[in-house]
Regions:
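Catalytic core of non-heme Fe(II) oxygenases with the double-stranded beta-helix
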Residues: 113-182
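Generic preference for hydrophobic/aromatic residues in regular secondary structure cores
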Residues: 11, 31, 95, 107-109, ...
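Residue-level signature for short turns and capping positions that connect secondary-structure elements
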Residues: 39, 100, 145-146
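A structural signal for short, well-ordered beta-strand segments and their strand-loop junctions
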Residues: 32-35, 92-97, 128-131, 140
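Extracellular-facing segments of soluble proteins and assemblies that are Gly/Ser/Thr-biased and enriched
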Residues: 70-115, 120
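Short acidic, gly/pro-rich beta-turn/loop elements at beta-sheet edges
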Residues: 42-44, 105, 142
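N-terminal auxiliary "cap/dimerization" subdomain that precedes the catalytic jelly-roll/cupin core
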Residues: 1-90
Length: 182
């Protein structure tokens, strides 16, 4: 299988679930991809699920209740196996059907929604697994190809105008409102 990320040194491609969960980030790498050519009709599953909100959580029971073709059933089995493997690993997987994420339109000079390239932060080391079965996957940008918006002088000045507190706590304000992640 050709590595679709060979031009992106920040993405490590693995060939199995075991390799995915047992690999560590190092150097410039900031993402791992378990690239698979999945059999089955994931589009059929999406078409038969009911979108209740912009983001609808899909339970195992919801999946099992679907009347599917043979190819749809293959897709369902892959999803169920992935959920089980993640659960056995100690993760808390959730399956979501997405229409769209909410947009952050509060400020016209900086956005903090998921449509803005961003990083994730956790006070403890944690694993986040994103899996796209149908539709466009998330984009990724190398760390050395981006600049934090809070370091752009014009944006930083706007944020300082928005902030109403002591200068010594400005960085805390940026973290508290997630401006530092974009």
């Amino acid at each position: 299988m050709k590595n679709p990320f060979s031009d992106n040194p920040q993405i490590e491609v693995v060939s199995s679930f075991s390799e995915l969960i047992n690999s560590n980030f190092q150097a410039d790498m900031n993402a791992m991809c378990w690239h698979r050519n999945l059999a089955g009709d994931f589009k059929e599953i999406v078409a038969k699920l009911e979108l209740k909100e912009n983001i609808t959580e899909v339970s195992i029971e919801d999946l099992l209740a679907l009347q599917l073709s043979e190819k749809g059933n293959l897709a369902r089995e892959i999803i169920l196996k992935d959920i089980q493997q993640l659960t056995d690993f100690g993760a808390s997987p959730s399956l979501n059907l997405l229409k769209c994420y909410e947009r952050d339109e509060e400020l016209d000079f900086i956005s903090t929604d998921v449509y803005s390239f961003h990083i994730d932060r956790s006070p403890i080391e944690t694993d986040t697994f994103l899996c796209t079965y149908y539709g466009a996957a998330s984009d990724i940008v190398a760390n050395d190809q981006v600049e934090q918006k809070i370091l752009i002088p014009e944006i930083r000045e706007q944020l300082k105008k928005l902030y109403d507190g002591p200068e010594a706590e400005f960085e805390t304000f940026l973290e508290e409102y997630f401006f530092d992640l974009h």
